[in-house]
């Protein structure tokens, strides 16, 4: 892309060269006078020019908004004294592009209207909060406007490269160009940084309640845009106003974020504290005031200090009582733990002796029970065989044999009861002894209690079946008996 130079009566190659007649370079009495020239150049070319760097309010570097463009201007202070700031860095309100002196007068008029609107709203009882915020913004704007002074020169261009490498047709439209200049207007013309800083330092956190739409309408930024860039009322439609408000919101958010990163805006405000936190801050703040300063305070503040001091003493007493209660409870708990540990030691020794005795008794009882169960098992088997042999005596059995069978059954039942009682007594003895869980488990695994109990259940069920069958046979025998009435008289005596 070939380089081209936009034709302008001031911003050209001859700006850095001395005048042939006077042998001096063209100078600008103030920094705002230089910004008047830059603003006109931007407006005609639709190409934003930005302040790229500055040093001690004496040296400034301006460049095209496109990084690849070689356009560059170096502006330096020429004079013995400089009424501006001598600190390093860009001057306050000069990190963007500047504005004209005529727009500065409009800027003051806008602030006056804003202050009057703030006072009018302050008289409205239904909008106390809105009026307070508006008044705070108006006061901050007025303070910044009164404290700012014009940076005096003279300033001269020491170096200029007036060529662009992008075509003029690719530059911005008028509305987009105006939107790109909103940060410069906020920073230079309206001193928006100082306004936001004043609002951030407000105890009521006014910056959080800042209404951008109200600021756009009342700050004078619309008047500056109309006068400087020639926008008509039709061009300042709702979409344009919305885009302007969006630029203001972005600028405000970036400023507050920078303050938070620097740690200046990191402290919580009074309305953000909870009740407990608020009292805690006051609780630590007022006792730190020396006594001789407290006597110099007003009477109301002295009462507040004394009240919070009493609250502090009461809280300390409550903490001491709570600590003593906790300590006493802790001592009782420690003593209880010590006694429990002593009892556990003695119980462990007793448990060892008991386990030895129980193990020996369990072994002896298991051996005796095993021999007894073997003997009882043999008796039960023999009895079961006898009962099974007697099952053939169901019908037609004489009375003597039936009685003998009943006596045998009773004997078997009695033997069954005795065996059951012995087993239950042995189980109760085993349950009365406090045997270790492992010993009891091993004994249950090795003892034949389960087999014996199963045999007893089988025998009991078998006896019930035999008894039921016997009852059936008795009924049948009764039916087969011939009544005495039906017997012939000659046979009754037989």
From Swiss-Prot:
Pfam family, one: BAF1_ABF1
Phosphoserine PTM sites in chain numbering: 400
Source domain of life: Eukaryota
Disordered as annotated region, ranges: 82-130, 273-328, 467-494
Annotated localization: Nucleus
Keyword hit for Lyase: no
Acidic residues compositional bias, start-end: 119-130
InterPro entries: BAF1_ABF1
Bias kind Basic residues: ranges: 281-295
Biased composition (Basic and acidic residues): 319-328
Mod. after translation: Extensively phosphorylated on Ser and Thr residues.
UniProt record, GO biological process: chromatin remodeling; DNA repair; DNA replication
GO CC, any one term: nucleus
Keywords: Activator, DNA damage, DNA repair, DNA replication, DNA-binding, Nucleus, Phosphoprotein, Transcription, Transcription regulation
Entry's Gene Ontology molecular function annotations: DNA binding
Main location: nucleus
Family: Belongs to the ABF1 family.
Function comment: General regulatory factor (GRF) that contributes to transcriptional activation of a large number of genes, as well as to DNA replication, silencing and telomere structure. Involved in the transcription activation of a subset of ribosomal protein genes. Binds the ARS-elements found in many promoters. Binds to the sequence 5'-TCN(7)ACG-3'.
Name of the protein in question: ARS-binding factor 1
Encoding gene, per UniProt annotation: ABF1
């Amino acid at each position: 892309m070939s380089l081209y130079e936009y034709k302008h009566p001031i911003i050209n190659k001859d700006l850095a060269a001395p005048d042939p007649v006077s042998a001096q370079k063209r100078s600008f009495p103030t920094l705002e006078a230089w910004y008047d020239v830059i603003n006109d150049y931007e407006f005609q070319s639709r190409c934003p020019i930005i302040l790229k760097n500055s040093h001690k309010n004496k040296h400034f570097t301006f460049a095209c908004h496109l990084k690849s463009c070689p356009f560059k201007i170096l502006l330096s202070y020429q004079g013995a004294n400089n009424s501006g700031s001598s600190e390093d860095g860009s001057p306050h309100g000069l990190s963007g592009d500047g504005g004209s002196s005529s727009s500065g007068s409009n800027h003051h008029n806008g602030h006056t209207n804003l202050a009057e609107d703030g006072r009018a709203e302050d008289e409205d009882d239904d909008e106390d909060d809105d009026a307070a915020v508006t008044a705070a913004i108006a006061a901050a704007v007025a303070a910044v406007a009164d404290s700012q002074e014009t940076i005096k020169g003279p300033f001269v261009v020491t170096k200029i490269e007036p060529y662009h490498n992008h075509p003029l047709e690719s530059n911005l439209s008028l509305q987009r160009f105006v939107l790109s200049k909103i940060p410069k207007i906020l920073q230079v013309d309206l001193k928006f940084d100082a306004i936001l800083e004043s609002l951030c330092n407000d105890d009521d956190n006014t910056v959080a309640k800042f209404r951008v739409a109200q600021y756009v309408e009342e700050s004078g930024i619309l008047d500056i845009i109309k006068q400087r860039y020639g926008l008509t009322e039709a061009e300042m439609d709702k979409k344009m106003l919305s885009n302007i408000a969006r630029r203001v919101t972005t600028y405000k958010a970036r400023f507050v974020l920078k303050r938070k990163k620097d740690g200046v805006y990191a402290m919580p405000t009074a309305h953000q504290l909870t009740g407990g936190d608020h009292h805690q801050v006051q609780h630590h703040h007022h006792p730190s005031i020396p006594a001789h300063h407290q006597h110099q305070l007003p009477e109301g503040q002295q009462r507040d200090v004394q009240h919070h001091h009493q609250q502090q003493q009461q809280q300390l007493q409550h903490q001491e009582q709570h600590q003593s209660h906790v300590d006493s409870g802790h001592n009782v708990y420690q003593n209880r733990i010590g006694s429990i540990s002593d009892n556990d030691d003695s119980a462990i020794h007793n448990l060892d002796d008991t386990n030895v005795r129980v193990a020996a008794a369990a072994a002896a009882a298991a051996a005796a029970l095993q021999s007894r169960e073997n003997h009882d098992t043999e008796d039960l088997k023999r009895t079961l065989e006898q009962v099974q042999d007697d099952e053939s005596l169901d019908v037609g059995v004489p009375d003597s044999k039936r009685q003998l069978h009943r006596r045998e059954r009773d004997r078997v039942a009695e033997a069954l009861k005795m065996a059951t009682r012995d087993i239950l007594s042995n189980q109760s003895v085993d349950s009365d002894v406090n045997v270790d869980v492992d010993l009891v488990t091993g004994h249950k695994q090795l003892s034949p209690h389960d087999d014996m109990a199963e045999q007893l259940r089988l025998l009991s069920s078998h006896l019930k079946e035999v008894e039921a069958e016997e009852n059936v046979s008795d009924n049948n025998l009764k039916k087969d008996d011939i009544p005495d009435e039906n017997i012939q008289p000659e046979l009754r005596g037989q």
